């Protein structure tokens, strides 16, 4: 299992929370103290809770599900896109549309529309349209790509969502909870941890902190995918071995029967 060290957390500024006047009292158990009017997050607890979150994400992917990364704040967008591409997962980095999960059937129609326009752009259909029609289609494609590009391949609901700043992504968290989809989130000192299934106490504003956690959760996805592939290969190898053994057992009685027939003929 990939670990996160205290050194990595300190270098990324994960321990810096919000100003003491901007906090959620429910985060008190995860706060070490305050310095110059800024809450300091207890990194020992960050390490402990990170391990649980990592293991859960790994198991989710190992079981065949995908993880939806959600980070629409500017500091999170690039890291979310890059890490989900590396781990072959899904993401929302621009704006969370209401019903993205709870009304997924409608969202899927928009995704299909996006895919259809992309095909039209590639197969020469644009060239058969007027300049205005082609321009309108391209604008529609760009708009859909901006909002839904990160979930184009998502044919079913995710097995979990990983959120940067659940206070900002309130709607996403509420939809996931309504559907029973587990929520993993980086939770800063101004957030409500009660709505999160697997919290990771930490700075959700610093780019380095966000990138660290996005990369680690992507690693968890990759670990889970590799474990799943290994299990499938092992099962396939076992099935092949069992097949060979069964065929071998079938050949032995046939050979014995042939010997009996041959002996009878000689007699």
Swiss-Prot record:
Alphabetized UniProt keyword annotations: Ribonucleoprotein, Ribosomal protein
Biological processes per GO annotation: translation
Database matches in InterPro entries: Ribosomal_uS2, Ribosomal_uS2_bac/mit/plastid, Ribosomal_uS2_CS, Ribosomal_uS2_flav_dom_sf
Protein name: Small ribosomal subunit protein uS2
GO cellular component labels: cytosolic small ribosomal subunit
Biased composition (Low complexity): 251-261
Bias kind Basic and acidic residues: ranges: 233-250
CDD domains: RPS2 (cd01425)
Keyword Ribonucleoprotein among record annotations: yes
Gene: rpsB
Organism: Syntrophotalea carbinolica (strain DSM 2380 / NBRC 103641 / GraBd1) (Pelobacter carbinolicus)
């Amino acid at each position: 299992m990939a670990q996160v060290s205290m050194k990595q957390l300190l270098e990324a500024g994960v321990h810096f929370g919000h100003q003491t006047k901007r906090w959620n009292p429910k985060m008190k158990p995860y706060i070490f103290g305050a310095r110059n009017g800024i809450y300091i997050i207890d990194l020992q607890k960050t390490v402990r809770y990170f391990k649980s979150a990592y293991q859960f994400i790994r198991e989710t992917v190992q079981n065949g599900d995908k993880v939806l990364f959600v980070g629409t704040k500017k500091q999170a967008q690039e890291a979310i896109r890059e890490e989900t591409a590396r781990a072959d997962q899904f993401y929302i980095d621009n704006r969370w549309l209401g019903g993205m999960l709870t009304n997924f059937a409608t969202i899927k129609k928009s995704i299909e529309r996006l895919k259809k326009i992309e095909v039209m752009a590639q197969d020469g259909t644009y060239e058969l349209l007027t300049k205005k029609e082609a321009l309108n289609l391209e604008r529609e494609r760009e708009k859909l790509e901006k909002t839904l590009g990160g979930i184009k391949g998502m044919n079913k609901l995710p097995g979990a969502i990983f959120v940067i700043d659940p206070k900002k992504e309130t709607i996403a968290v509420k939809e996931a909870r309504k559907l029973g989809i587990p929520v993993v989130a980086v939770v800063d000192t101004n957030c409500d941890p009660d709505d999160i299934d697997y919290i990771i106490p930490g700075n959700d504003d610093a780019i380095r902190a966000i990138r660290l956690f996005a990369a680690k959760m992507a690693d968890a996805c990759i670990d889970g995918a590799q474990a799943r592939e290994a299990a499938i290969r092992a099962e396939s190898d076992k099935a092949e071995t069992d097949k060979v053994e069964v065929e071998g057992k079938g050949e032995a009685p046939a050979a014995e029967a042939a010997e009996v027939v041959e002996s009878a003929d000689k007699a």
